[in-house]
Structure formats: structure tokens, C-alpha cells
From Swiss-Prot:
Lineage: Bacteria, Pseudomonadati, Pseudomonadota, Alphaproteobacteria, Rickettsiales
Name recorded for this polypeptide: Signal peptidase I
Subcellular location per the Swiss-Prot or TrEMBL entry: Cell inner membrane
Location (main, coarse): membrane
Periplasmic side, ranges: 41-265
EC number: 3.4.21.89
Gene designation: lepB
Membrane topology qualifier: Single-pass type II membrane protein
UniProt record similarity statement: Belongs to the peptidase S26 family.
Topological region Cytoplasmic: 1-19
Species: Rickettsia canadensis (strain McKiel)
TM helices/strands, residue ranges: 20-40
Length: 265
């Protein structure tokens, strides 16, 4: 009996392509609906989140909006949110800033709709009550800058660390945002701060209030972290080989799989 090897090969190839397409579809669905990785390029959440931390975030935590659907966020599919779940104070949220929809921000949620928010001498007041804030030590950044480290507790009991640049020779380097006007958070919008209080473009400054519709995901943990990125400059085989060793050496092993809500330090 003669076997048609060409037909069998075609069937095998077709099955392989179907399997590949199935895997790709599952991966896309996971990214669109369940979990998405993000890279953090700035230090506004330092030292909770550092530059070049790779974050896993859950898409389902707040339900879904047009802005949270990866690859489709440029298409106005619908308004508002579906399967919405209310965010909590202290959540670390990935969102689209209302003044620049081309980028993503990651900040800590401080103020809920209807709240009255103000900072006085770097202390957060929520509805005229100051939150608990205790200095617990210092933090030295990779660039050698010294920060004062504070443990803050929100009204719902959520605790986290915030950081403020330490004075240099007794001179405070930047204290523009430690005392603010009163902010009244509108319905359907939220007030955000960066944990790196002196170096964050947040709701005190240009960001303003963020609509719930702009929320993308809730940040959960750091799955990878490195001090440098090897794709910053020219891409090429030789360049990758030259950068491979320093890139491997720059991996922050102590940050891998770190829970962003763990304050047991």
C-alpha cells in the first residue's frame, strides 16, 4: 500500500498551525481579560516600585472599560465599566491619565469620590482627619540619594511606605507639594499620589482627578526587576552580546516576586 506522505505532511502542518493559533488566542484572552504585565519607566512610586520593575496586574479587579482592553483601547467600544468592582484606598492602580491617553501611569489610590483631601506639612488629611504617619527609617537609592521613609495608615487600615527626599546640609531640596490646596474629589473620579512624594506627577499637580473609566488594572506583584535595560540604544547582535553580561549582573534578585502590598520589612 502506498502512503501519500505529502498529504500527511499537509495535515500535520495544518494541525500545528491550529494548535499555535489556539495558544495565541488563549494568551491574548489572558492579557485582555485576566492579567497583564507592565514595565515601570519612572521613579514616582520609589521605593515601592523602582524604574525597570516589571509588574503583574489583574485586569478583572475593577471590571472592564474601553481603556482596560489591551489592543482595543483605541476603539470606542463602549462607555463606562462592565462587571465593575469598587477600588479601595491604598490600591496601586495602572490607569490612563485623562490629560494624555497615550501613556499609562501607576500610582496609589488615596481619595475616593466625595472625599476632601489636603496635604499639610506632608501629612495627608482625608475628610479633615489626618492619617497616621510614622517615620521608620531611611532609604538610599541606587543613585545615592537619601530618602526619609514613613509608614502611613489609611482610614481603611491599609498600610504602606512613602518616601521623602532627605534634607542636604539641613536644606530641604524640594518641598513644593507638601502643602496643598483642598481637593474635593468629584463623583466617579479618584485622587492619586505617588509614594515618592517629592518626585511624582500626581493628583496634586498636573494629573488631576482620574475617572474610574480610565482604570486599567490593579498592580499586584513584581515578577522581574533590573537596574538597566539592554534595548535602550541601538539594537543589533553585537550590541546585545556586549550588553548581556552587565544586564544579567544588574538583575535585582531581591525584588523578584515581591508582593506590592507587603509592609513586613
Amino acid at each position: 500500500m502506498q502512503i501519500d506522505t505529502k498529504t500527511n505532511t499537509n495535515k500535520t502542518t495544518a494541525q500545528e498551525w491550529k494548535s499555535f493559533a489556539f495558544v495565541v488566542c488563549i494568551a491574548l484572552l489572558i492579557r485582555i481579560l485576566i492579567m497583564e504585565p507592565f514595565t515601570v519607566p519612572t521613579g514616582s512610586m520609589k521605593a515601592t516600585i523602582l524604574e525597570n520593575d516589571y509588574i503583574f496586574s489583574t485586569k478583572y479587579s475593577y471590571g472592564y472599560s474601553n481603556y482596560s482592553l489591551s489592543f482595543f483601547d483605541f476603539i470606542p467600544l463602549f462607555k463606562g465599566r462592565i462587571f465593575a468592582c469598587e477600588p479601595e484606598r491604598g490600591d496601586i492602580v495602572v490607569f490612563r491619565p485623562p490629560n494624555d491617553m497615550s501613556v499609562r501611569y501607576i500610582k496609589r489610590l488615596i481619595g475616593l469620590p466625595g472625599d476632601k483631601i489636603q496635604l499639610i506639612d506632608d501629612i495627608i488629611y482625608i475628610n479633615d482627619k489626618k492619617i497616621e504617619r510614622t517615620e521608620v527609617g531611611t532609604y538610599i537609592s541606587e543613585e545615592g540619594r537619601k530618602y526619609l521613609k514613613f509608614k502611613e495608615t489609611l482610614p481603611n487600615g491599609r498600610t504602606y511606605f512613602s518616601y521623602k527626599l532627605a534634607p542636604i546640609f539641613g536644606v530641604i531640596s524640594d518641598d513644593r507639594y507638601g502643602n496643598t490646596d483642598v481637593f474635593y474629589v468629584p463623583e466617579g473620579k479618584y485622587f492619586f499620589l505617588g509614594d515618592n512624594r517629592d518626585q511624582s506627577n500626581d493628583s496634586r499637580v498636573n494629573l488631576g482627578f482620574v475617572p474610574f473609566e480610565n482604570f486599567i488594572a490593579k498592580a499586584q506583584f513584581i515578577w522581574f526587576s533590573t537596574k538597566i535595560t539592554w534595548w535602550d540604544n541601538d539594537i543589533g547582535v553585537i550590541n546585545l552580546i556586549l550588553k548581556l553580561k552587565p544586564w544579567i549582573e544588574s538583575v535585582r534578585l531581591n525584588r523578584i516576586f515581591r508582593n506590592l502590598y507587603n509592609t513586613d520589612e
